[in-house]
Amino acid sequence: FYDAAVGVNDDNFGGIIKSPLDLMIGTFRLFNIQLPSHTTSPTEYYENTSDLIRQLTLMGMHFYEPFDVAGYDAYHQYPIYHRAWISTNYLTNRYDFIRQLVSQNPNMPDPLRIDPVDFVRNKIPVATAANARTLIIELAKYFLPLADNLTFDTAADDTAGLTAERLNYFLTAFLKSPQLDPDPEASWTIRWNNPVDPEVVRRQLENLFNAMM
């Protein structure tokens, strides 16, 4: 395998679709989300885990209850294998799961929510975060499997881990959905460097995290 082209081909890195459980656990690890203690807060613990199991079901993984004795189709069903995790409904619910995590959504318990503002402040240097484009490139290193040689220039992205078109999509979701300012990137820099419009900053980061995750 390691001598074969498929074993060393960069295009194959990050190519397997994660199970809903992989997606959930990986996201919680990245953001250091902790469940309430099952010994000191059992009610909250079981409420939270019950909600997470419900989310897994919505994303296509009936936890410990596969449809047949062979297990989950994604692990054995030729020829689709891991693609079995994706259907129109399952994909929509994956998007919705992330949206609930990063937004102020009452359906997601407080201990399980992600605070995008705190994450950027704690993980990204101030000067990097103040520039919308360098912020996106830096976040890609956390969120995406391939983040080398990233550029927003469509004429210079041949060796990039992501296309410039994809990065520009993230930029549009970040600052132009909706566009609040004539110069969105300059306005982002002002808002990040100064304690003004914190709610706008939060909403824009929520949009960015939702698009990238």
Q: Where do the model's predicted regions map?
A:
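Flexible, low-complexity segments enriched for small/polar residues
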Residues: F1-M213
